Amino acid sequence: MKVGVLALQGSVSEHRLSMERLNVDVVDVREPSDMNGLKGLIMPGGESTTLRKLLVNSGLWDTISGSDIPIMATCAGAILMGKSDETTFEKMDYRIDRNYYGRQKDSFEKNIRIGNNQKFRGIFIRAPAIVSVGDGTEAIAWDGEMVVGCTMDRHMALTFHPELNDDLIFHQMWIEGL
Protein backbone atom coordinates (compact mmCIF):
# COMPACT_ATOMS: atom_id res chain seq x y z
CA MET A 1 0.00 0.00 0.00
CA LYS A 2 1.23 3.48 -0.84
CA VAL A 3 -0.01 6.74 0.70
CA GLY A 4 1.04 10.31 0.13
CA VAL A 5 1.82 13.16 2.48
CA LEU A 6 0.92 16.60 1.19
CA ALA A 7 4.39 18.17 1.25
CA LEU A 8 3.59 21.87 0.93
CA GLN A 9 3.97 22.89 4.60
CA GLY A 10 3.58 21.51 8.10
CA SER A 11 4.90 18.37 9.76
CA VAL A 12 5.54 16.38 6.59
CA SER A 13 8.55 14.44 7.88
CA GLU A 14 6.74 13.49 11.10
CA HIS A 15 3.79 12.03 9.20
CA ARG A 16 6.20 10.22 6.85
CA LEU A 17 7.97 8.68 9.84
CA SER A 18 4.64 7.58 11.36
CA MET A 19 3.72 5.79 8.12
CA GLU A 20 7.18 4.23 7.81
CA ARG A 21 6.89 2.93 11.40
CA LEU A 22 3.68 1.20 10.27
CA ASN A 23 5.54 -0.29 7.27
CA VAL A 24 3.50 1.74 4.77
CA ASP A 25 5.11 3.06 1.58
CA VAL A 26 4.88 6.85 1.59
CA VAL A 27 5.63 9.55 -0.98
CA ASP A 28 5.65 13.33 -0.86
CA VAL A 29 2.85 15.01 -2.81
CA ARG A 30 3.71 18.40 -4.30
CA GLU A 31 1.84 18.31 -7.62
CA PRO A 32 -1.16 16.47 -9.08
CA SER A 33 0.89 13.73 -10.78
CA ASP A 34 2.31 12.72 -7.37
CA MET A 35 -1.16 11.42 -6.43
CA ASN A 36 -1.17 8.69 -9.08
CA GLY A 37 -1.52 5.23 -7.53
CA LEU A 38 -2.06 6.42 -3.95
CA LYS A 39 -4.49 4.64 -1.61
CA GLY A 40 -4.71 7.64 0.74
CA LEU A 41 -3.45 11.17 1.38
CA ILE A 42 -2.32 12.81 4.62
CA MET A 43 -2.96 16.55 4.81
CA PRO A 44 -0.72 17.95 7.60
CA GLY A 45 -1.26 21.04 9.65
CA GLY A 46 0.31 24.42 9.04
CA GLU A 47 -1.62 27.59 8.33
CA SER A 48 -4.92 27.00 6.54
CA THR A 49 -4.98 30.18 4.42
CA THR A 50 -1.43 29.55 3.22
CA LEU A 51 -2.18 25.87 2.64
CA ARG A 52 -5.21 26.77 0.52
CA LYS A 53 -3.11 29.13 -1.63
CA LEU A 54 -0.36 26.53 -2.06
CA LEU A 55 -2.93 23.90 -3.04
CA VAL A 56 -4.48 26.21 -5.65
CA ASN A 57 -1.10 27.33 -7.05
CA SER A 58 0.17 23.75 -7.34
CA GLY A 59 -2.99 22.52 -9.07
CA LEU A 60 -3.69 20.15 -6.19
CA TRP A 61 -6.86 21.95 -5.04
CA ASP A 62 -8.82 20.83 -8.11
CA THR A 63 -7.25 17.37 -8.06
CA ILE A 64 -8.19 16.76 -4.42
CA SER A 65 -11.63 18.37 -4.84
CA GLY A 66 -12.46 16.00 -7.67
CA SER A 67 -11.00 12.92 -6.01
CA ASP A 68 -12.55 10.40 -3.64
CA ILE A 69 -9.15 9.47 -2.17
CA PRO A 70 -9.33 8.87 1.60
CA ILE A 71 -7.74 11.75 3.52
CA MET A 72 -6.28 11.96 7.02
CA ALA A 73 -6.24 15.66 7.89
CA THR A 74 -4.63 17.23 10.96
CA CYS A 75 -5.05 20.75 12.35
CA ALA A 76 -5.08 23.12 9.32
CA GLY A 77 -5.81 20.13 7.12
CA ALA A 78 -8.91 19.47 9.25
CA ILE A 79 -10.02 23.07 8.68
CA LEU A 80 -10.01 22.41 4.92
CA MET A 81 -11.98 19.14 5.20
CA GLY A 82 -15.02 20.44 7.11
CA LYS A 83 -17.50 23.28 6.74
CA SER A 84 -16.31 26.74 7.64
CA ASP A 85 -16.79 30.40 6.78
CA GLU A 86 -13.75 29.93 4.54
CA THR A 87 -13.50 28.01 1.26
CA THR A 88 -12.94 24.33 2.08
CA PHE A 89 -13.17 20.92 0.41
CA GLU A 90 -16.28 20.10 2.52
CA LYS A 91 -15.51 16.38 2.23
CA MET A 92 -16.75 15.78 5.79
CA ASP A 93 -19.94 16.90 7.51
CA TYR A 94 -18.80 19.00 10.46
CA ARG A 95 -18.42 22.68 11.32
CA ILE A 96 -15.00 23.81 12.44
CA ASP A 97 -13.88 26.92 14.30
CA ARG A 98 -10.41 28.00 13.22
CA ASN A 99 -8.00 28.98 16.05
CA TYR A 100 -10.64 27.96 18.61
CA TYR A 101 -8.04 27.43 21.31
CA GLY A 102 -6.28 30.76 20.70
CA ARG A 103 -2.98 31.97 19.32
CA GLN A 104 0.40 30.26 19.02
CA LYS A 105 1.28 31.15 22.61
CA ASP A 106 -1.87 29.35 23.74
CA SER A 107 -0.68 26.01 22.31
CA PHE A 108 -0.74 23.11 24.78
CA GLU A 109 -0.57 19.36 25.42
CA LYS A 110 -3.18 17.42 27.35
CA ASN A 111 -4.79 14.03 27.61
CA ILE A 112 -7.81 13.62 25.38
CA ARG A 113 -10.35 10.81 25.40
CA ILE A 114 -10.62 8.36 22.54
CA GLY A 115 -12.84 5.35 21.96
CA ASN A 116 -13.79 3.53 25.14
CA ASN A 117 -12.29 6.11 27.52
CA GLN A 118 -8.74 5.41 26.39
CA LYS A 119 -6.36 8.37 26.84
CA PHE A 120 -4.11 9.93 24.20
CA ARG A 121 -1.68 12.83 24.67
CA GLY A 122 -3.01 15.49 22.30
CA ILE A 123 -0.72 18.25 21.09
CA PHE A 124 -2.72 21.36 20.14
CA ILE A 125 -0.87 24.08 18.23
CA ARG A 126 -3.06 27.10 17.43
CA ALA A 127 -5.73 24.46 17.08
CA PRO A 128 -9.22 24.56 15.62
CA ALA A 129 -12.18 22.73 17.18
CA ILE A 130 -14.99 20.74 15.64
CA VAL A 131 -18.04 22.58 16.99
CA SER A 132 -20.70 20.31 15.48
CA VAL A 133 -20.87 17.05 13.55
CA GLY A 134 -23.50 16.09 11.02
CA ASP A 135 -25.09 12.85 9.90
CA GLY A 136 -22.60 10.21 8.86
CA THR A 137 -19.77 11.80 10.84
CA GLU A 138 -18.53 9.84 13.85
CA ALA A 139 -16.71 11.57 16.71
CA ILE A 140 -13.64 9.56 17.76
CA ALA A 141 -11.74 11.94 20.08
CA TRP A 142 -12.81 14.50 22.68
CA ASP A 143 -11.30 17.25 24.81
CA GLY A 144 -13.91 17.19 27.56
CA GLU A 145 -17.15 17.53 25.57
CA MET A 146 -15.46 19.21 22.56
CA VAL A 147 -14.97 16.95 19.55
CA VAL A 148 -11.33 17.05 18.41
CA GLY A 149 -11.37 14.08 16.03
CA CYS A 150 -13.90 12.46 13.72
CA THR A 151 -14.29 10.12 10.78
CA MET A 152 -16.64 10.05 7.82
CA ASP A 153 -16.50 7.37 5.17
CA ARG A 154 -12.74 6.72 4.84
CA HIS A 155 -11.70 10.25 5.89
CA MET A 156 -10.31 11.24 9.29
CA ALA A 157 -9.99 14.77 10.69
CA LEU A 158 -8.05 15.61 13.85
CA THR A 159 -7.64 19.10 15.29
CA PHE A 160 -4.44 18.13 17.12
CA HIS A 161 -1.09 16.71 15.95
CA PRO A 162 -0.91 12.90 16.39
CA GLU A 163 2.28 12.81 14.31
CA LEU A 164 4.13 14.54 17.17
CA ASN A 165 3.29 11.67 19.53
CA ASP A 166 4.94 8.24 19.56
CA ASP A 167 1.52 6.56 19.84
CA LEU A 168 0.44 5.66 16.28
CA ILE A 169 -3.18 4.77 17.10
CA PHE A 170 -4.74 7.39 14.79
CA HIS A 171 -2.42 6.64 11.86
CA GLN A 172 -3.11 2.92 12.41
CA MET A 173 -6.90 3.44 12.53
CA TRP A 174 -6.80 5.43 9.29
CA ILE A 175 -4.61 2.88 7.49
CA GLU A 176 -6.88 0.03 8.63
CA GLY A 177 -9.83 1.88 7.06
CA LEU A 178 -8.24 2.13 3.62
Question: Predicted regions span which residues?
Answer:
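Cysteine-nucleophile active-site neighborhood
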Residues: 47-112
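Beta-strand-turn-beta hairpins that frame and shape the catalytic cleft
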Residues: 1-2, 117-120, 150-156
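C-terminal and late-domain segments of enzyme folds
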Residues: 10, 129-178
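Redox-cofactor binding/interface segments in oxidoreductases and associated redox assembly factors
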Residues: 42-43, 73, 158
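Conserved beta-strand segments of alpha/beta enzyme cores
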Residues: 25-27, 121, 138, 156
